[in-house]
């Protein structure tokens, strides 16, 4: 058996490993948290049978290592809460992308800042106790009896839904939790912790269920790593799109209208319009055909598409009109297919590329709604490509290149790409899956784009490529999806007439480059911290007359900029110049044009750049050339 520990590889005979734990073989090294035993995550306390071929130790740099570290910390937090508040009930506490959370039934009590400090102190105490963490496997019935005895009803509910007869709990000191694991060997492995916040949640995310209290936290192997993370978090708070959206007057959400339904204010709408015009122009350049489709469709359409059978819980309730049932659309695809089907298509017509900025509505539980990132009404930059088998490789390559072009234009430079393959339950022949998956991989290989395989994570109707972008703080944001669909062409009987005169099924490729406008806008706000590049800025220039006697000249400058299609505002108030400059800086307007007596007499303007300062005097023509060049340069700012 091979034991891989970083760069070090050791070989063991079968007789040397039987009955021994991984920890015994690896040595007491608190830099490693979990092991992959022949590819399966296991506790370091796992006892080997002698049949294993390879054991790989994982540290905090691995995803599984981090998950294990954070999941154990969530158990430590739950233990701390139970020791301080024994009357509260535990529910679930997973590791998440950045840290962990645990939900507690507090019977209506809301955790305070002081509570979080006390829980944190108690966690440090539990860590110092160096409690061994033990995995116990037992019959489900015994586990139910155990949790009944200690009054943890949520655990019983979970157990009743587990089909397995043998389940596992993890025990540290007097605290035990139902869990699949894996976990750290000992509480002392956790070194640096911070509880970040508490908020309300609902059992299973359903507002009809019990209201819970959720505590979020983070932990690291060193204090330095924790401090670095907290610094990033502080910066992220300053960039929070919900805060900046309000400060910069970009969008709002109103209880009277409904959660997850966005109002785009004039400044937000100005940015959206720029993105829309750019998006349409670039699509028309690449032979996409722009379409528009209605917001509602008859129930018959959604029956054919399968949405009523498989997606109804995510749809808004039906409406009835003239004895017909209608639904607000959750997706644009069926409409694009109906456009395709309005005439017989020849093999010569393909590929056909329809694109639309289509607004869709999906029911998301209120507990998961989050600013612009998770909403109920949103606009997708949708396109559907109908192609012959011999065209799919080139089509995928062109879509990937197009995605990179678009995202680069907005200033993004770091990407991660994933190919999701066939899940257990799927539609479409194995041959179609193989051909489509191969086309996705070959396209990326030919473009020299590195990617990771997300095994079995494709949708049931086809494999896909996902492109995520990284922002200045290293956070990942989901953007582009390129998705094959073997389901809808069958359901709608989509065909083209091939050169042999036989009707054949085209490949259907769904793709969205930005994802949704709302989510992409949130990403842009946080990426730039509200300091949008000039071409995107809702107001590009603020004209600031120093006094009332300069307003007439300032108006001429304002009109000239307007005539040159510059998004401009003018501050005619009687405030002092410094106050006007401060206001423009707060609004993050890229350029300020200051006009006073000297500028008026010399027919010049004084130019100031946001966060940079004074650029000196120049003619209006020189200033226009300056900003037009910058706008042409796109994301440079």
Please annotate each region the language model reported.
Residues 1-91, 96-637:
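NTP/phosphate- and nucleic-acid-binding module
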């Amino acid at each position: 058996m091979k034991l891989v520990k970083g760069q070090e590889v050791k070989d063991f005979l079968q007789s040397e490993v039987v009955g021994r734990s991984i920890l015994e073989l690896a040595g007491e090294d608190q830099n490693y948290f979990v092991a992959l035993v022949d590819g399966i995550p296991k506790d370091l306390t796992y006892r080997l049978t002698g049949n294993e071929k390879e054991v790989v130790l994982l540290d905090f740099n691995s995803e599984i290592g981090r998950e294990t570290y954070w999941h154990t910390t969530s158990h430590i937090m739950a233990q701390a809460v139970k020791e301080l508040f024994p009357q509260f009930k535990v529910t679930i506490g997973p590791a998440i992308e950045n840290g962990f959370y645990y939900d507690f039934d507090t019977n209506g009590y809301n955790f305070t800042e002081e509570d979080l400090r006390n829980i944190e102190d108690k966690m440090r105490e539990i860590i110092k106790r160096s409690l061994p963490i033990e995995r116990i496997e037992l019959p489900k019935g015994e586990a139910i009896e155990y949790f009944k005895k200690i009054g943890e009803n949520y655990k019983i509910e979970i157990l009743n839904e587990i089909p397995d007869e043998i389940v596992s709990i993890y025990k540290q000191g007097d605290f035990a939790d139902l869990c699949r694991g894996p976990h750290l060997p000992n509480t002392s492995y956790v070194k640096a912790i911070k509880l970040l916040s508490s908020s309300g949640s609902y059992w299973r995310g359903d507002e009809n269920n019990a209201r819970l209290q959720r505590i979020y936290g983070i932990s690291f192997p060193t204090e330095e790593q924790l401090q670095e993370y907290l610094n990033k978090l502080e910066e992220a708070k300053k960039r929070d799109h919900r805060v900046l959206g309000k400060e910069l007057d970009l969008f709002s959400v109103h209880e009277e209208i409904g959660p997850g339904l966005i109002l785009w204010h004039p400044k937000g709408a100005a940015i959206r319009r720029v993105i829309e015009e750019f998006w349409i122009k670039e699509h028309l350049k690449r032979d996409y055909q722009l379409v528009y489709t209605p917001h509602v469709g008859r129930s018959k359409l959604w029956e054919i598409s399968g949405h009523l059978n498989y997606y109804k819980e995510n749809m808004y309730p039906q409406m009835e009109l003239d004895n017909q049932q209608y639904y607000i659309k959750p997706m644009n695809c069926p409409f694009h297919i109906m456009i395709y089907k309005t005439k017989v298509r020849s093999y010569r017509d393909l590929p056909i590329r329809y694109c639309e900025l289509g607004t869709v509505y999906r029911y998301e539980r209120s507990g998961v709604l989050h600013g612009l990132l998770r909403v109920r009404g949103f606009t997708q930059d949708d396109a559907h490509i109908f192609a012959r088998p011999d065209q799919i490789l080139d089509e995928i390559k062109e879509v990937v290149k197009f995605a990179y072009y678009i995202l680069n234009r907005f200033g993004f430079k770091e990407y991660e790409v994933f190919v999701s393959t066939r899940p257990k339950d799927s539609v479409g022949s194995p041959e179609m899956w193989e051909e489509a998956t191969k086309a996705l991989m070959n396209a990326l290989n030919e473009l020299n784009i590195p990617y990771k395989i997300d095994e079995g994570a494709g949708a049931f109707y086809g494999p896909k490529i996902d492109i995520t972008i990284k922002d200045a703080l290293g956070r990942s944001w989901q953007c582009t999806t390129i998705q094959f669909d073997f389901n809808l062409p069958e359901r709608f009987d989509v065909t083209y007439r091939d050169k042999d005169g036989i009707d054949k099924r085209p490949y259907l490729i769904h793709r969205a480059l930005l994802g949704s406008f709302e989510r992409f806008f949130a990403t842009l706000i946080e990426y730039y911290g509200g300091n949008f590049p000039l071409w995107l800025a809702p107001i590009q220039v603020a004209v600031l007359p120093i006094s009332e006697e300069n307003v007439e000249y300032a108006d001429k400058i304002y009109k000239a900029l307007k005539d040159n299609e510059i998004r401009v505002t003018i501050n005619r108030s009687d405030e002092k110049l410094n106050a006007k400059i401060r206001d423009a800086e707060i609004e993050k307007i890229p350029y300020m044009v200051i006009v006073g007596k000297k500028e008026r007499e010399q027919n010049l303007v004084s130019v100031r750049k946001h966060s940079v300062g004074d650029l000196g005097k120049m003619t209006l023509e020189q200033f226009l050339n300056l900003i037009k060049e910058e706008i042409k340069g796109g994301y440079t700012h």
